[in-house]
């Protein structure tokens, strides 16, 4: 029998109300009681709209990722040069608003789910690969626009930038020291400067 949610508006409300909770506490750390408190709904109301907790978590991850992507698009579209477009990602990740909502959903979900929850791990991997492809595209366009050096390896640069950003977030959140985020993102900026045509 196919599961049919009772109401799209209630379903959307549940997703929005629990997205930050899942991003902060993770799948394993979020109980049905947490979901009830976050939504002010009963277990029956929640599960009348979702088959199980996993389905709520997957929808919450999708919502968190879509929110992050929207921030990226807005910042990238506002930037004029390809260098500025790439640096816009750094600005998003250093924004306290992202920290206050639990941090990077790709990292949070990927770290928790890598050995424990295949469906969430796959979603996080898709998000990470999409992030990489967006950077590769910007770098390649920057090469064509003669903003970046012709021999710049877009794939390598994109992976390095992601590793620096995600590593900076991990260090900063683990040590509760935002200055380390600033330091590592500064190094990432210097790395991007090296591919720019002066």
Predicted regions and their residues:
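Basic, helix-initiating cap at the start of DNA-binding domains
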Residues: 1-25, 29-41, 55
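Hydrophobic alpha-helical segments that form the core
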Residues: 152-171, 187-191
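Amphipathic alpha-helical segments used for helix-helix packing
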Residues: 99-119
